[in-house]
Design a protein with these regions (language model features):
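Acidic catalytic/metal-coordinating carboxylates
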Residues: 36-37, 63-67
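Short amphipathic alpha-helix used as the core "switch/output" element in two-component signaling
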Residues: 43, 65-77, 94
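Receiver (REC) domain active-site loop signature in two-component systems and cognate sites
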Residues: 59
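C-terminal output helix
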Residues: 88-90, 107-117, 163
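Basic, Lys/Arg-enriched C-terminal extension of HTH/homeodomain DNA-binding domains
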Residues: 176-198
């Protein structure tokens, strides 16, 4: 049984390091996909799904920071943890400023890395959920968005109708459309799905 909440990837140009890191993480119960360069990773992985990548900083052709930038430009929810054999404090600070969740110097302590991976996977799943909610909200009309905001604030239908200068029936139709488009059946499910992005 894998302990992965979402896919775990390692990108490192040093094959012995790649293999030993994968072996160590598999011994902790993870299922791991490995790549020896950034291009192979980009061609193989769906950047719009949750995941965690352990990324070497210094690789030929495409450095880890370049790969991370490409992922950020794609709005990827995949969490990044840097691993390097040649790190320093300024490099770590820059990586964290760029959105990496953690930075480890090789050789790395397995327990510390596992804790960071578990945290990164949870963060990635939350990021994917937020992105999914934002995309779903884009399908709403302007008026449906207005009604949604008022619903999330806890306003009653008649009060919404008065505030938006429309009939009660119009509010009920918009509210029903919002529920259908967001694929929820209750107010609690609606708030859970989009309350954090409004």
């Amino acid at each position: 049984m894998s302990r992965n909440l979402c896919p775990l990837y390692i990108v490192d140009d040093e094959v012995p390091v790649l293999e030993s890191m994968a072996f160590m993480l598999e011994s902790y119960g993870y299922s791991v996909d490995v790549y020896s360069n950034g291009q192979d990773f980009l061609q193989s992985v769906n950047l719009h799904q949750a995941g965690c990548v352990l990324l070497d900083c210094r690789m030929p052709e495409m450095r880890g920071q370049e790969l991370h930038l490409l992922m950020r430009n794609q709005c990827s929810p995949i969490s990044v943890i840097y691993l390097t054999g040649h790190g320093d404090i300024p490099m770590a600070v820059d990586a964290l400023k760029e959105g990496a969740l953690d930075f480890f110097q090789k050789p790395v302590d397995g327990n510390a890395l596992v804790a960071a991976i578990d945290n990164a996977m949870e963060c990635s799943l939350k990021n994917q959920e937020k992105q999914s909610a934002k995309l779903t909200l884009q399908s709403l009309t302007r008026r449906e968005k207005e009604v949604l905001i008022l619903v999330v604030k806890g306003m009653k239908n008649q009060d919404m109708a008065n505030q938006l200068c429309v009939s009660l029936r119009t509010i009920e139709v918009h509210r029903s459309n919002v529920m259908k488009k967001l694929e929820v059946e209750s107010l609690a499910a609606l708030i859970h799905k989009v309350g954090h992005v409004i």
